[in-house]
């Protein structure tokens, strides 16, 4: 389910929101001088410079939509967790990435189309180990946190991109088999 596409997509969400709006461009330019991975460098530069108009944003949306679709299908048999009745490494691995969507306030509009994934997230998020993420510095519980305000600022444009993606690829990304 969750492979390198999910890691990259989560990074794009973080860069198009928090990093783009809170880190001065000069700091990013300096940081990029030491990024050894050309794909990561180009992705970061594009997302910082172009915002939601970066082609990497659409790719990130596609990756997450594919993951959410697979999750929705897996959870459609009323199992509580991805592999069945038990919390597994699948939840431990993917939960923190969905936490980013929650932190930037994208969770509600993104998961409207995936009620089983939303219910799964609610179960995962209610676990004590996941709640502990809220106690770390730079958490996004507060509405004035960097993740929260940058997410709210970016959300309308990002939501339009998500809608655009869903309209363009509705034939490929439906919850029906």
Describe each region flagged by the PLM.
Residues 1-126:
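GST-like fold's C-terminal all-alpha helical module
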């Amino acid at each position: 389910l969750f492979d390198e596409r999910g890691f990259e997509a989560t990074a794009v969400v973080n860069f198009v929101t928090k990093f783009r709006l809170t880190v001065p461009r000069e700091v990013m330019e300096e940081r990029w001088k030491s990024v050894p991975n050309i794909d990561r460098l180009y992705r970061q530069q594009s997302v910082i410079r172009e915002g939601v108009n970066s082609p990497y944003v659409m790719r990130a949306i596609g990756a997450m939509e594919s993951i959410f679709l697979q999750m929705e299908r897996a959870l459609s048999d009323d199992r509580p967790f991805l592999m069945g009745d038990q919390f597994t490494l699948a939840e431990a691995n993917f939960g923190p990435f969905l936490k980013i969507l929650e932190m930037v306030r994208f969770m509600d509009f993104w998961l409207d189309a995936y009620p089983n994934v939303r219910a799964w997230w609610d179960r995962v998020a209610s676990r004590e180990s996941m709640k502990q993420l809220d106690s770390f510095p730079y958490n996004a519980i507060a509405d004035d946190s960097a993740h929260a305000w940058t997410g709210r600022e970016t959300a309308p444009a990002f939501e339009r991109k998500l809608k655009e993606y869903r309209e363009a690829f509705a034939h490929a990304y439906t919850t029906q088999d």
